[in-house]
Amino acid sequence: MNADLPKNSKVVVIGGGVAGCSVAYHLAKLGWKDTILLERDQLTSGTTWHAAGLVGQLGSSSTITRLRKYSLNLYKELEKKTGLSTGLKQNGAITVATSKERLQELLRQATAAQLFDVN
């Protein structure tokens, strides 16, 4: 197997989980051609495989919210570009406030969701 690997590369991404695959994908999208992705087994077969795979849309900051929206759109885009299923299933959620404090928190989240155009 080592004989198949080049001796040099500008970028070596170690780990074929969601983070490593994302880095390799985005580098390729930016035109980087001298990139290697190393994974000891199958892609996404480690920690990523064990994760629940939930992609919430509203984050604790505007940066996290933008990243989550980008990720959700990327999964949809990848399915269109490749014709392969990412396994993305969009489901809603219902949260019930059982106290006045929790109601205020949910109202704050609803306002933030509107501000960031989160559906």
Which positions does each model-derived feature cover?
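Beta1/beta-strand and adjacent pyrophosphate-binding region of the FAD-binding site
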Residues: A3-A19, I36
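Short, flexible hinge/linker loops that cap or flank conserved catalytic cores
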Residues: A3-P6, K29, L88
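A secondary-structure boundary/capping signal
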Residues: I14, E39, A51, Q90-G92
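Hydrophobic alpha-helical packing residues
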Residues: L27-A28, A113
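Glycine-rich FAD pyrophosphate-binding loop
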Residues: A28-W49
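Dinucleotide-binding Rossmann-like beta1-alpha1 core, especially the glycine-rich loop
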Residues: G53-N119
